[in-house]
Amino acid sequence: AEVVALVTVGDWLEEELITGRTFFRTTVQKVYKGDIPHEFVLAQEGCSTWTYRNYPVFTYGNQLLLFLIKYDVSMYRDTYDLVEYPDAYELISTYSTVMYVTQDDSGMSYVLDALGVMTEWSQINQPTDCPAVAHPGQEQLLQIRDNLTKQDPVLAAIAPSQADPDRPVASPGDLYRLTDLEDYFARLSADYT
């Protein structure tokens, strides 16, 4: 990824039915890797007529931890007349790198790995180095699910509904503490400098 950032999805700008993309104005809350404008355009694969694996199109106010690359329309330029956004970025690997951010009532931030891909990757690559899946208590879990529902009702269906320390990891809906991921990103940055 060129950029790893915590962002908030803003206004819907347009959709391109030809490419199956939707564009949103997006605000950066924090950058963990790379350089990106404070406000940029997020190109998401999916639109009103088609979604990737039935995964929902983002909505206003979604807080996301994203792994991004610069959006490149050059493969469409010769065939279609498209609006170009010079400050547009898109998800690397479509949805496998989308992580929704939410909080419990104490303000602790959690990241929902909606597809379980991060957990699966971390187990294969460097299990001792990667952050552990968080296992919040039942009360915290209900708060997290409630806050996810406020962002998007579909998200609450993905999050675990029972506090279960024996729940299999690498499952859709794994939760991580944002602070654990930030520490992990800092260690990765130190390793590559």
What do the PLM-derived regions correspond to, one by one?
Residues L17-G46:
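OB-fold (S1/OB) nucleic-acid-binding surfaces
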Residues C47, T51-T193:
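Netrin-like (NTR/C345C) domain of secreted extracellular proteins
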